[in-house]
């Protein structure tokens, strides 16, 4: 019997540790598969791959593997047709690309831009380009963003199939960079934005890296932690400040002036996810245990209230909207993952 036959609205999985990073698989043959990263304040951390058994309506842990330090982000290859190898990337001390098999997950490549030093500048985040899945971009506390190119080689025994090289590295901000995201504008391959501790949102073009555009600066110069592009209208993006209770919506055509502020949360916001299928819906999640869905189509008129609210049993660390199944949102809090039908 299918999920839709049962019409269950919420599925829950309890991990053996606090869940921080989390993301949906996008492969069409792995509908309810997610990756979860542990948050343990020591070297030894874990990543789990879990899947929903649609017969039993229970999440099953398919695979667990070790990861040095907590993952700051994890992402599956944006492969909606299932034509590329089944790859998962994680950021932490370095960017790692893993190959997921039926029984084991193995490290394909470790991308390290600092070959001459024992010191590594931790990566705060990364993004995987949807148009060109051979491109990834990382953000780091060393003020830089690095764009990586992956190569997939031929099978030669047990030689890793995937390797990578630095396409470009740029000093993106005056202080630490906390997030990076590719834009779908201009073909979707060359434009990306970053946010950081200097409180600015900056836009870059891989074809013209000699200059960047400041789209927004926080009035109090509070660090900006996250940015998220609208999936359907590349003019819009959302960002939030460290310890901030509101999410700011920006229009790149009107720099430095927010077109909306979403401020119903009662504690600091931790996550933002735009709807994959609609330009006017966005989900925000916060320490107030709430996940809120907003309809922003009346911008620039003020948006007073969300259209949907869900209260979890703990502070929500992360929210992800399933790109291939737009009626499902995943949240994590404490040691729990929940997927919610919206």
UniProtKB/Swiss-Prot annotation:
A Pfam match: WD40
GO molecular function: protein-macromolecule adaptor activity
Record has Nucleotide-binding as a keyword: no
Places the protein is found: Cytoplasm; Nucleus
Keywords (A to Z) from UniProt: Cytoplasm, Developmental protein, Nucleus, Repeat, Ubl conjugation pathway, WD repeat
Main location (coarse class): cytoplasm
Pathway membership, UniProt: Protein modification; protein ubiquitination
GO process terms (BP): protein ubiquitination
GO cellular component, one term: protein-containing complex
Per-repeat ranges for WD: 6-52, 60-100, 108-150, 165-206, 213-252, 257-296, 303-342
Subunit structure: Interacts with DYRK1A, DYRK1B and DIAPH1. Interacts with DDB1. Interacts with ZNF703. Interacts with human adenovirus 5 E1A protein.
Family as reported in the entry's similarity comment: Belongs to the WD repeat DCAF7 family.
Record-linked PANTHER family: WD REPEAT CONTAINING PROTEIN (PTHR19919)
Function statement: Involved in craniofacial development. Acts upstream of the EDN1 pathway and is required for formation of the upper jaw equivalent, the palatoquadrate. The activity required for EDN1 pathway function differs between the first and second arches. Associates with DIAPH1 and controls GLI1 transcriptional activity. Could be involved in normal and disease skin development. May function as a substrate receptor for CUL4-DDB1 E3 ubiquitin-protein ligase complex.
Protein name: DDB1- and CUL4-associated factor 7
Source species of the chain: Homo sapiens (Human)
Gene name for this UniProt entry: DCAF7
